[in-house]
Amino acid sequence: MAKRLDLTDVNIYYGSFHAVADVSLAILPRSVTAFIGPSGCGKTTVLRTLNRMHEVIPGARVEGAVLLDDQDIYAPGIDPVGVRRAIGMVFQRPNPFPAMSIRNNVVAGLKLQGVRNRKVLDDTAESSLRGANLWDEVKDRLDKPGGGLSGGQQQRLCIARAIAVQPDVLLMDEPCSSLDPISTMAIEDLISELKQQYTIVIVTHNMQQAARVSDQTAFFNLEAVGKPGRLVEIASTEKIFSNPNQKATEDYISGRFG
């Protein structure tokens, strides 16, 4: 668990459109890395390349290297499904299977892998729900539909589903954007706990959230409309928010643009 990610000279294209240019960065194990920047700067595009989710879009391609420890996830013969198992994703809006029970939501990935042993499934459901700080709230209604939970509970259910398959990395695409402040606090507390076991990358538009939950922060920006997004700088979150190297970073953090 908790592997390192390294990007070297990564360029991302959709057909002939150059979406992101020349990204090189290291994402350390058992830490939280935040991607920040204005809309359209490429931060979510980069996030999705980390587990090849962008490939669902026709014409998408990546140049450069993305290494999970020492394994290039884009090397010939690498199965994208295996990549997504090792590098899980939590999306912007909670997306549990609404008619499926809470228990079956959590173990859906294991069942897709062919696991049928009831004890293994039940034990995994409990451990994953505990890991997502949801067990005490749902342990007496595991057979009720996941769609009946509150928004914040649904997002934690999605996190439980992601960790049930024992990934090395968790990607989170604005996981609190549709949640109320109390639910957001619960997710942020959970992120701080999960980083003890997982490598976490989070995209957020909330500067305060990035400052609260992350160990390092990467700032992305656009040179101009129609130009590719670029990584401006990456450093410890303390440095990015107190003394960044680039004026563009300071301007964005201070709210002068974006």
UniProtKB/Swiss-Prot annotation:
Binding site for ATP: G37, P38, S39, G40, C41, G42, K43, T44
Chief place where the protein resides: membrane
Enzyme Commission number(s) from the entry: 7.3.2.1
Known catalytic reactions: phosphate(out) + ATP + H2O = ADP + 2 phosphate(in) + H(+)
ABC transporter domain span: 5-247
Family (UniProt): Belongs to the ABC transporter superfamily. Phosphate importer (TC 3.A.1.7) family.
Known partners and oligomeric status: The complex is composed of two ATP-binding proteins (PstB), two transmembrane proteins (PstC and PstA) and a solute-binding protein (PstS).
Role according to the record: Part of the ABC transporter complex PstSACB involved in phosphate import. Responsible for energy coupling to the transport system.
Protein name: Phosphate import ATP-binding protein PstB 1
Source organism of the structure: Mycobacterium tuberculosis (strain ATCC 25618 / H37Rv)
Organism classification: Bacteria, Bacillati, Actinomycetota, Actinomycetes, Mycobacteriales
